[in-house]
Amino acid sequence: MASLINIGVSGLGASQSGLFTTGNNIANADVAGYSRQQNVQSAKSSIQSGNVFIGTGTTLSDVRRVYNAFLENQLRTTTSLNSDASAYLNQVSPIDNLLSDADTGITGALKSFFTALQSASAKPTEDASRQLLLTSAQSLSKRFNTISAQLNEQNSNINGNLASMAEQVNKLSATIAQYNDQISRVSAVQGSPNDLLDQRNEAVRQLNELVGAQVVEREGNFDVYLANGQPLVLGKTINTLETVPSKTDPTRMSLQLNRGSTSMDITSSITGGEMGGLLRYRSEVLDPSMNELGRIALVVADSINQQLAQGIDKNGEFGAALFGDINSAALISQRSIAQAGNSAGAGNLDVTISDTGKLSTSDYQVTFSSATQYTVKKLPDGDAQGPYDITATPLQEIDGFKLALNGGAPSAGDSFKITPTRNAAAKLDTVLTDPKRIALAAPLSAVSGSGNQGTGVITQPELTSKLDIYDSTQRIDLQNGLKYSTPVKLVFGDETTNPQSYKLFDAKGTELSSGTIIPGESNTLQLSVPMVDASGNPIMDGVTQKTFNFEMTVAGSPKEGDNYTVSLTGAGSADNRNGQAVIDLQTKATVEVGANGKGISLTDAYGKLVENVGGKTAQAQMDSNATNALQTSAKAGRDSLSGVQLDEEASNLIKYQQYYTASSQIIKAAQEIFTTLINSL
């Protein structure tokens, strides 16, 4: 009887364990990372009875996790990829909308500015149209400022998110190390701790949501490594992540791995997870977009200011700048960042924009090999240019900018990050406040002599000597020369000779130059005028008198004595030729201008930026969809094996209930047999 009762009791125990395991599966059905468990039963040792062996019941040999390491690793990998793609998409989508939308992007503001410029140029004497142009210029500069502010805010958010995620990574690393410790201790004496193993797996999966990590199982422990092979967790030991300002750019946070007393920058090697997506977005979209937007802002300010300086305003004065000076003392000092660790006596570098048409959208690394010699490398992986001499005259031009020392001399090994265009959009401002100061008129105007008899016709003179707003000496000399060396008079000789002669005289009647034309044809005259100051003294360039040059076309047949007077354009002129020249900047190749003079326009440059960001956004959406599908598939694969199927567990409940009832019947039968036996005595 004892054997039959023991068999029944073993069945009761096994069925009860089955009910416990099934109930535990059902209770944890929605717990992330939980692997369903199965009871593993085995028959107890049989006993010999005569020449046969009779069973003695069952025993619970194990409660097994239904687990597959390959499926778990696949889920971790796809989780990392999807988190990366989602983080990237979440960052790039709003910027794509910002740049491409007509109400928030630059295209609409740029179009409105040039439309207002066309109106002002069509009515150069009206103050209302000039005021509208000023308002449009202010709107344009504010639009640049607003977009730049949002890009900078996004950078700040990325910095904050990286710091927060680094803390989460450290907490998860510590959790994994604790699980390693607990699992090692429990496994040594009590077998496999299923729930701890599941919880450790889930912690690793959550870690992969933040950063791509690989697991190597060693003696029951999980060693966790980053993509570059640097360890986060080694058994019970963890290495911590920390965000610190980048040594080359303190406005960008970098990631540092702390291993005991040593630290290393691992920013460039972080891939996967939200961190990888944020860093990838920052390097692929955010920084290039800020640089491109800044380059466009620099070209807008420089090209428009340069052209307006060539003209005459409504007051009869030389043109004033519409936008702020792109090479102000404050701006040239903000384009260079001294690397942390430079020698104590080293100052910084001043970065002067010398040719906006040659600017790229890259940042640069400048490294000194001595106090004066340096090389320049286009980031992130360009070839080194140079060496150059920082004290050379003139200064070396590099992709449209020049470098000069600001402060103490550097030492060998000192390095600087150069950001020629990074902050330009934020600094663009409209400085002109008086609409009368907008220089829409060309500087020189010509009138025909009142007594002219011939059929000669001239075009208005075009000043071919260009004023440089960044060279104060050249600018002042040319303005004085135009002001005090005019008017000049062009007088034609005997019309019966062919070619017909002409002479150019100054205001005192002194002959300046002479030449000939072919009567009846279109003749382009290139004329040069020696420059004098307000006192009539020559304006000199060393030992040579400076001149300004202009050209005009003469057609028809002038009579002898016919003349044309070329003067500085006066106040209130209806001339709009300089305004038209500014309008032409809308389509003129002013960006990425190569040695052959070919480039792209402002509108095309911004369109290229929008197209690039739009392309990145479209690719990010496809990547997000693809990685989401992969993650969903990986999770489904894992859940199909390890997940709790409630229908199956409900069936198991019924099975174990029946098992329990049947086992109790065995005991009941044993009791009845025992009772019958007792009663028969």
For each of these PLM feature ranges, what is it?
Residues 1-681:
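Structural signature of extracellular appendage/secretion-system components
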